[in-house]
Amino acid sequence: MLRYLSAGESHGKGLIAIIEGLPSNIPMDINRINADLGRRQQGFGRGNRMKIEKDRVEILSGVRDGKTLGTPLTLMIENLDYKNWTSIMSVEKLEKQNIIVEPRPGHGDLVGSLKYNHKDIRNVIERTSARDTAIRTAIGAVVKQFLSIFDIEILSHVISIGRAHYVPFVEDLFQYKSQIEASPVRCLNPTIEERMMGEIQRAKETGDSLGGVFEVIVRNVPIGIGSYAHFDRKLDGILAQGLMSLQAIKAVEIGNGIEGSSKMGSQFHDEIKYSEAKGYYHDTNRAGGIEAGVSNGEDILIRGYMKPIPTLMKPLKTVDMGTKEVKEAIIERSDNCAVPSAAVVAEGICAFAIAKEFLEKFRGDSIEEVEWNYERYMNYLRSR
């Protein structure tokens, strides 16, 4: 079974992940991992920490001679900012501490302090921080290299930021991937891009933050990934859980799910067609590539709805956890909009979910064994 564990604090020495369950002999290019880490750091609205960190991954185990070994693969990303936090983040007993007791509305400060009985909110901030998304991006970049063997491609773009909303005007966004990557907000439409950047700038000038919506598209996933047999094996449920675990994501949509809630069934469902060349297919994709928790061969479309970042330069009112007096929430260094960055992280999250279920179906200890199982299944589909 493909799984991972990650560890590390935002201002600690670094971030670590151990990935278990990858087959052996997958070609692994560290430059592709670092490229995704660089993409995560970009985007209009990012904070000053991106000027400090130059994220590069180190592979500590599980890869030799450019290929996976089939054993646990360990990744590490150094936090360059740690040198500025050595006294605060020391593992030894601190002689003097500046205790943080003013929780931010919308963040994990209050609930984390109460759940784990912390007197200092710093102990919560360090793990709830979106700095964790760096290692999740690296994990995603690893499994993307596995999926690419089977021509599975992943793309993300931003649909809205604040009041600036974009409706895609092309059918195949993969043809415009380079233009999306070149956009500071990952938006293909230059006019809407300017509006999005204007929204972010206005929020920054008033000490506020902004959320938005991004879409991830996964192409060439074969029919049959996921299962309707049990609730926890449904592919859309697995994808939704993955995205909901990403910091600040408050809603997830598969295909045209929200729009479909107000339509007749005859207007929403995708008619099934067949041809010798394509096999079974659909001309429309309102289901978002998943039916009954199982991939149907069309592009998988999933959207993440991101709330505004809770850290505000003009903070909201809160309660001092020591005195119970009304105070202003703490100000922690932060982005004021991270929707473009979240879209990149979401690619990796979706990649991991797809890879996990892909290996569940085509399991093997080596990539060659997985390919054999995959080819037999694809031949079976062609015979139907």
From Swiss-Prot:
Binding site for FMN: R127, T128, S129, Q247, A248, A292, K307, P308, I309, P310, T311, R333
EC number: 4.2.3.5
Record's keyword terms, sorted: Amino-acid biosynthesis, Aromatic amino acid biosynthesis, FAD, Flavoprotein, FMN, Lyase, NADP
GO biological process, one term: aromatic amino acid family biosynthetic process
Keyword Amino-acid biosynthesis: yes
Species this chain originates from: Alkaliphilus oremlandii (strain OhILAs) (Clostridium oremlandii (strain OhILAs))
The encoding gene: aroC
InterPro entries listed in its UniProt record: Chorismate_synth, Chorismate_synth_AroC_sf, Chorismate_synthase_CS
Subunit text: Homotetramer.
Family assignment from sequence similarity: Belongs to the chorismate synthase family.
A Pfam family it matches: Chorismate_synt
Protein name: Chorismate synthase
Role according to the record: This reaction introduces a second double bond into the aromatic ring system.
Presence of keyword Lyase: yes
PANTHER family (alphabetical): CHORISMATE SYNTHASE (PTHR21085:SF0)
GO cellular-component term (any): cytosol
Pathway in which the depicted protein is active: Metabolic intermediate biosynthesis; chorismate biosynthesis; chorismate from D-erythrose 4-phosphate and phosphoenolpyruvate: step 7/7
Bound cofactor: record note: Reduced FMN (FMNH(2)).
Cofactor(s) annotated in UniProt: FMNH2
